[in-house]
Amino acid sequence: MVFHSSAFPFLRGAYLSNWAGVCAGFYTELAEAYGLTICVENSMDVDPEPLCALFREISTAQVRVCLDIGHAHYAQVPLEQWFDELGEHIGYLHLSDNNGQFDEHLPLGLGNVDWALADSLWRQLGRSVPMTLEVGGITGVEQSLTYLKRHGYFGLGGSRI
């Protein structure tokens, strides 16, 4: 089950710590009560710090990060930083393309996300994680799958983890 982090970009300091503590308790309790794996997605996050703060408070493997590559692309820090700081907690990926300004949900290859870099960072995780293509319908899915297979990204048409 995926939840948006809903962490406003201006949350820092004590406000961020309070938010992280409340959310960590909620997600942990929900995951354990219902036997769920919960993934918290970077949604409005301009950098990984809100999710890092959240995961400093979480001690269960039932709560993970859903890293949305498209959202990370238009954030204020490089994709490498998202993987470096959250990699051990990543349990799910959302894939869509954009031109670096806002969330366009374009088919992969139609924006300017560096998919070779994203694939390399995914491989460095050393484990496979579920992925969702958020690309606006069956045509976008077909275009994205063709793109992934042509380049051998994320284990399609090439080597797998």
Regions picked out by a protein language model, each given a short descriptive name:
Residues 1-64, 159:
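Active-site acidic/histidine proton-transfer and metal-coordination neighborhood
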Residues 29, 48-67, 72-161:
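Histidine-acidic metal/acid-base catalytic patches
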